[in-house]
């Protein structure tokens, strides 16, 4: 400190220049040694291009997408059509069918309900194990066709079980009486099994129901008719008569006796008829 006070002004200036030149050399040397020819030590370099990125004081506001969660309300489409003046436009009407036999297929449902009118879609419901749950759903484009199907097929026996029909989303409490007689042929299992739906009023008049004569049927019935090909001899015809005897009304005189064997027809239960049907299909597959 005392030496600096004794120095002249020129010596002090010269000494300061020497100190500054020496500091620059040190910093450049350090920079070349560390960075391999860089300009010198500096802030940490970021990114693949070694660009000195400085944080900006400004922020960019990105637009946030907000999804509106509106409560679901049924019937908005129909209300919109009515508000637009299209009150005459009819939308699809869902028909729920329950108490179905497990042997009923989608093809049976289509052929049965398409006799009423155009069917928009149809499906049999299955459980988690892949077995039919005994329910189905049919959608008609026209509401009038759905009500007509309800009046004709409600409580009608299909494979020995009465179908229960209900229109979803509508008032179907008023049930109209069944028509006098309606025959609908339903073909299943690739054309080898035919079901005929015969509808009569409960306690109604006389009529033949698949080979029976003059019965007062307790409920509309569905009988099965088997084709006669792939079989020879009188055994097939006798079996055919046995299936016809299934459709007799109470108190009716059966005319479905076997024509081939000449024996008196034997009354069979629904389980026996199903077994005969399965054996017939097995024989038909073996012969084919």
UniProtKB/Swiss-Prot annotation:
BP-aspect Gene Ontology terms: defense response; mRNA transport
Record-annotated disulphide pairs: none
Gene Ontology molecular function: any one: mRNA binding
Biological role stated in the UniProt entry: Export adapter involved in nuclear export of spliced and unspliced mRNA. Plays a role in disease resistance. Mediates multiple defense responses triggered by NEP1, including stomatal closure, hypersensitive cell death (HCD) and defense-related gene expression.
Protein name from the UniProt record: THO complex subunit 4D
Organism: Arabidopsis thaliana (Mouse-ear cress)
Domain (RRM): residue spans on this chain: 93-170
Ranges of compositional bias, category Basic and acidic residues: 264-281
Compartment annotation: Nucleus, Nucleoplasm; Nucleus, Nucleolus
This protein's UniProt keywords: Acetylation, mRNA transport, Nucleus, Plant defense, RNA-binding, Transport
């Amino acid at each position: 400190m005392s030496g600096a006070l004794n120095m002249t002004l020129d010596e002090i200036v010269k000494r300061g220049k020497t100190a500054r030149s020496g500091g620059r050399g040190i910093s450049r040397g350090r920079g070349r040694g560390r960075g391999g020819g860089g300009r010198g030590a500096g802030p940490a370099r970021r990114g693949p291009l070694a660009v000195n990125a400085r944080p900006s004081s400004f922020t960019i506001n990105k637009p946030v997408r907000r999804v509106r969660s509106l409560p679901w309300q049924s019937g908005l489409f129909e209300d919109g059509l009515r508000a637009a003046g299209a009150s005459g436009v009819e939308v699809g009407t869902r028909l729920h069918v329950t108490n179905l036999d497990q042997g009923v297929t989608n093809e049976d449902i289509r052929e049965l309900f398409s006799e009423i009118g155009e069917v928009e879609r149809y499906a049999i419901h299955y459980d988690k194990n892949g077995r039919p749950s005994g329910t189905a759903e049919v959608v008609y484009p026209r509401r009038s066709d759905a009500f007509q199907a309800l009046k004709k097929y409600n409580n009608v026996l299909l494979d020995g079980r009465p179908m229960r029909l209900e229109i979803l989303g509508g008032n179907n409490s008023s049930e109209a009486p069944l028509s006098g007689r309606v025959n609908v042929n339903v073909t299943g299992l690739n054309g080898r099994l035919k079901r005929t739906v015969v509808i009569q009023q409960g306690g109604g008049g006389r009529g033949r129901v698949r080979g029976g004569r003059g019965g007062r049927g307790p409920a509309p019935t569905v009988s099965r008719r088997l084709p006669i090909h792939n079989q020879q001899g009188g055994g097939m015809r006798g079996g055919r008569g046995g299936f016809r005897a299934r459709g007799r009304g109470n108190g009716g005189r059966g005319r479905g006796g076997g024509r081939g064997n000449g024996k008196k027809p034997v009354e069979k239960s629904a389980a026996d008829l199903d077994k005969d049907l399965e054996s017939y299909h097995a024989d038909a597959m073996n012969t084919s």
